[in-house]
Amino acid sequence: MSSSSIEDIKGKSHRLRGSLLESLANPTTGALRESDQTLIKYHGSYQQDDRDLREERRRQKLEPAYQFMIRTRTPGGVITPQQWLQLDAIATRYANHSLRVTTRQAFQFHGVIKRELKTTMQAINAALIDTLAACGDVNRNVQVAANPLISRAHADLYTDAAHLSEHLLPNTRAYYEIWLDEKKVAGAGEEEEPIYGPHYLPRKFKIGFAAPPINDVDVFANDLGFIAVIVDKTLLGYNVTIGGGMGTTHGDPDTWPRIGNIIGFITRADLITISTAIVTTQRDFGNRTLRKRARFKYTIDDRGLDCIVGEIQQRAGITLQPARPFVFEHNGDRYGWIEGEDGHWHLTLLLPAGRIADTEGSTLLSGFREIAQLGIGEFRMTPNQNVVIAGISPGQRAAIDALVTQYGLDTGNRAPTALARHAMACVALPTCGLAMAEAERYLPDFNAKLQPILEKYGLAETPILLRISGCPNGCSRPYLAEIALVGKAPGRYNLMLGGDQRGQRLNTLYRENITETEILAALEPLLGRYQQKRLPSEGFGDFLHRTGIIALPPYPTHRHVISSTLQA
């Protein structure tokens, strides 16, 4: 659909209402009207179909097996044990018997059919979780560092992020009228949208809060990022980054992944003001005629960073202070138990590709259900698609450990290679309509093929950051990985190499449109050289750059590597 069509749909939607009620009530099809397929995204859902069944249903002269993905708005991915049990029940009753943790710390339900869509939405809201603005041209789910090592400062960080998430919600009551049967006030007219306006944003907008020394949120991949500045265990404020974004288009030189620029420091008191100024600047200056160039990163590149920063400061009435020193050590998760400052413990467990399900050889869904039934602590989803069972007292650890062992949940500690512990993948086939190749379903197979090579060179326990994406939109943030596979066609990928383990450098194209056999053949000699010639503690991506095997792509520096001048 063209940019002009989408902008027209938004503008005429009566604040995201459209004809959704009529589409939902139509029993003759499992799909929505075309315009409503755009609008339902703002309510937290995508219309999809099972692509594994497309050809068979076409032969049977049936419409596609339409279904809906529903995504939650859970800032920082924090939920209670009771909420976990409710989401589990929803997944089992209405979806495909699985919960999917996203790279933005949300939950996704897949396989919901249209006639049960409203009931499912109501069940999610009954858990005191909503889906408003989880998709669409608005601010999406706000990421928050899952690092439990700085408990007091982290609590403030989460509070700020949750407050910002609420502040940036659309003002329309459409969500509550359509899904929760709220009565529209007669004669009230359309609501004002003071932040978004009648056409909302040109494209999606992503925000992340990072807490050094861990960059688990990949803060530089966000349109707007906040890097916590913590002094004497107190959160003073944030270094602000703008202009990150992973999406690109294969073969189109006018699109590219980009990492954000650090533009200065703000105090906590200025968080809402500066964020509003940044979002409204993108609202007014973003490209609404060419959707592939509508993200904030292109607005900055087209108009110039100085111009955009000046506009932001003028709107906010704030002069940004010089950025404060910080250091990122890595962007991964630390598995196992970690003690927080307050004496409580936090257990990080691996969720392969973020999928929580009971399958042959795996009882993740049942295991986490049993832990939730203990009613202790809270669950925190990580930006690496894993889960932290947080806030556990020393005396409660044994009960959790017993269930972890019983249900085999400690895969992070038992994974055969460090690669498996540092891998991510998007959903891709069969549900994502944009996928060109497999990702989530392919990840374990690819890991199994790469494992013997790693063992051959003594690298089985060497952390290497691997990410697989089914298409170039990059939901798994592949362009930051040391090794990335980006889907080009069924069974074929672009091989990207040279990111780092801190989320501060983009990788570059190494081989284009190649098969699994060609990928493994390309990687083996590089891994062999890495084993022989690496420096102590040198990451694979850093090695590739130091030795000249990989060079920075021919883009301006700010699209690819963060300067070290701000590192303490």
Swiss-Prot record:
GO BP of this protein: cysteine biosynthetic process; hydrogen sulfide biosynthetic process; sulfate assimilation
Pfam families registered for this protein in UniProt: NIR_SIR, NIR_SIR_ferr
Residues bound to siroheme: 475
Function: Component of the sulfite reductase complex that catalyzes the 6-electron reduction of sulfite to sulfide. This is one of several activities required for the biosynthesis of L-cysteine from sulfate.
Database matches in SUPFAM superfamilies: Nitrite and sulphite reductase 4Fe-4S domain-like, Nitrite/Sulfite reductase N-terminal domain-like
Assembly description: Alpha(8)-beta(8). The alpha component is a flavoprotein, the beta component is a hemoprotein.
Molecular functions (GO terms): 4 iron, 4 sulfur cluster binding; heme binding; metal ion binding; NADP binding; sulfite reductase (ferredoxin) activity; sulfite reductase (NADPH) activity
Record-given protein name: Sulfite reductase [NADPH] hemoprotein beta-component
Keywords, in A-Z order: 4Fe-4S, Amino-acid biosynthesis, Cysteine biosynthesis, Heme, Iron, Iron-sulfur, Metal-binding, NADP, Oxidoreductase
Cofactor(s), by name: siroheme; [4Fe-4S] cluster
Reaction equations catalysed: hydrogen sulfide + 3 NADP(+) + 3 H2O = sulfite + 3 NADPH + 4 H(+)
PROSITE patterns from the UniProt entry: NIR_SIR
Co-factor remark: Binds 1 siroheme per subunit.
Species classification: Bacteria, Pseudomonadati, Pseudomonadota, Gammaproteobacteria, Lysobacterales
The keyword Oxidoreductase is annotated on this UniProt entry: yes
E.C. number: 1.8.1.2
Binding site for [4Fe-4S] cluster: 426, 432, 471, 475
One Gene Ontology cellular component annotation held by this UniProt entry: sulfite reductase complex (NADPH)
Pathway(s) annotated for this protein in UniProt: Sulfur metabolism; hydrogen sulfide biosynthesis; hydrogen sulfide from sulfite (NADPH route): step 1/1
Family, similarity comment: Belongs to the nitrite and sulfite reductase 4Fe-4S domain family.
